[in-house]
């Protein structure tokens, strides 16, 4: 199962601190071999800036190591972080969470039947699918 973290605060927080520098940083939960072992298929963060969502994500197949430091200066009062343990879809950046559609963001833990969900999607949402994951299909 994936690892999810979210924060809402009155004042902007340094996202990197919570992911990599806190006494028990969030990234450490991805390194532990709990429930299926390391969550190193990909990672991503979504944060809100002036009422617009921004996303940074990386997939294991696209980088040698994860670059958590690339978000070192990000500040936001709302953010979501996801450490992926792939079950469906390759370990690529496009399959890393969170996903964005218009002004909505989504991250997911678990598995659903992708083909069954696609049957119920309107064609306009099917055209929006960018990943191979069940999660993005469920989101749309």
Annotated model-derived regions:
Residues 2, 104-116:
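Conserved beta-strand-loop-short alpha-helix elements that form
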Residues 15, 55, 89-91, 114-117:
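Short helix/loop capping segments that flank catalytic or ligand/cofactor-binding pockets
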Residues 9-10, 82-85, 109:
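Fold-independent oxyanion-binding glycine-rich loops
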Residues 39-43, 49, 74-76, 81, ...:
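Short, basic and Ser/Thr-rich N-terminal targeting/leader segments
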Residues 1-60:
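Extreme N-terminus nucleophile/cap motif
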Residues 29-30, 59-70, 81-102, 120-122:
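Short acidic (Asp/Glu) patches
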Residues 113-140:
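Short histidine
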Residues 45, 110, 138:
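Residue-level signal for inorganic ion chemistry
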């Amino acid at each position: 199962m994936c690892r999810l973290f979210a924060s809402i605060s009155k004042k902007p927080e340094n996202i990197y601190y919570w992911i990599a520098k806190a006494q028990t940083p969030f990234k450490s939960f991805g390194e532990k071999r709990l429930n299926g072992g390391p969550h190193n298929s990909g990672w991503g963060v979504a944060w809100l800036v002036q009422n617009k969502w921004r996303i940074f994500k990386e997939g294991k197949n696209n980088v040698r190591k994860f670059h958590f430091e690339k978000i070192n200066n990000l500040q936001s009062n709302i953010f979501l972080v996801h450490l992926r343990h792939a079950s469906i879809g390759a370990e690529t950046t496009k399959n890393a969470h969170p996903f964005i559609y218009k002004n909505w963001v989504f991250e997911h833990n678990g598995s659903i039947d992708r083909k069954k969900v696609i049957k119920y999607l309107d064609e306009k949402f099917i055209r929006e699918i960018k990943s191979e994951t069940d999660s993005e299909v469920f989101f749309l």
